[in-house]
Amino acid sequence: MKQFPEGFLWGGAVAANQYEGGWKEGGKGITVSDCARSHLDVDVQDYKKQNEVTTADIEEALNTQDEVYYPKRHGADGYHHYKEDIKLFAEMGFKVFRLSIAWARIFPNGDDAVPNEEGLKFYDDVFDECLKYGIEPLVTISHYEPPINLVLNYDGWYSREVIDMFVRYCEVIVDRYKDKVKYWLTFNEVDSMIRHPYTTGALIKDRFPGKNFNEVIFQAMHHQFVASALATKIVHEARPDAKVGCMLTKLTYYPYTCKPEDVLQAQQDMRSTYCYSDTQVFGEYPAYLLSKFKNEGINIKMEPDDLKIMKEYPVDFVSFSYYSSSCVAKDDNCLKKTAANTNVAIKNPYIPSSDWGWQIDPIGLRISLVDLYDRYRKPLFVVENGLGAKDELVNGTVDDQYRIDYFDAHFKEMYNAIVEDGVDLMGYTSWGCIDIVSESTKQMSKRYGFIYVDCDDLGNGTYKRYKKKSFDYYKHVIETNGACLFED
């Protein structure tokens, strides 16, 4: 009988900044995401404009209590609904639930002398609720949630001081939750700092006048690499059987034509995304990244033990997000473009697109799994994947057959990668297993979940939960460990 390996971890994923809400409750401080404004008047495919942030924007955000144009302040109101939501996840049969800890719930300003006990107790309750149903928490330590104080008073991860603050934060949460959490991720989509430095690195370009901003970004990235290695050390010392992973954005690139120039461009673009996971897996900077630093005059300041720390504490597994593939060409000026995950790419004429222009490519997931496993020879974990769509609630449910078709095709390609290609895949968590505020466009109407949340792009609604048609589909996939995918 065809089915996934025994012990395969099926589940779903959210991030605190998109799910929780409760932005000023329980002693929580303000985060970079609480100050990220939605731009409903900007083209949803214009990722750069959607995510540009200035110091003036932050000052404006801090002077308002508005939750309409700052939708991550309310999210899906998981802060008040998590027990109800976890019960629904258990009904689907989740083996694992990926979530993040909001740094500012534990240290409201990042540099506080003592942690916030109310925040620590909140996550105790969340993890206990998961474990009550036999659901393993998979915890992201930092998922676009640095306290805003780190931006305004330290210039974010550019400052070496932030490593020490992050390490103290890790020491507190790992000591507190080591008996409840076995699986950890250090930084979400660690490679994304080059594309959105504000949410990932707490960096704002106008705060570095006269500086090479790419150098600023890579300096901040170096600090995150050191911090990630130290976090891995902390977890392993606290719980030797725990597993720590890195997490990258899997941007799978195809050459638009077989012209050697296009093939080379695709290879170079792939390397530009792999350099971050290469560093965390192998514990050292790859030669091609060092060449980039030299050729572009980027000077990274390091402490004497930095490279030693990175080498001694690499990650145990590689996790990633996969939503779509992209086409690239050496000269793309005359080619039609479309949106993708945190970038814009050439439109592939052979595959369909979602409501938001992201191209749907299940085979690309298999290609990604094979590429990553051949490169790293470490267990893999798909921790984000799914279809953002415009769902319509009718008679208390959503007939989202389009989402079922999406998952069905992707799950079959995951199976092929495991059985035919020999990939060691630990598990799968669908992104936004319950509807949450979109990271890229700050919209609630871009829905990914098996569970519909009654809330619109302006925060209006009851926040009541409704099961979609895909809820029962995923429940059946999990209870049969994928065998139902191959039934006639």
Feature annotation, model-predicted:
Residues M1-D66, E91, N109-D111, L120-D488:
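Active-site region of glycoside hydrolase catalytic domains
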Residues H81-D85, P304:
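Alpha-helical scaffolding within the catalytic cores
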Residues K95-A102, E136-T140:
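Short, well-structured secondary-structure segments
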Residues I101-P115:
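Glycine-rich, proline-tolerant flexible connector loops at the mouths of alpha/beta enzymes
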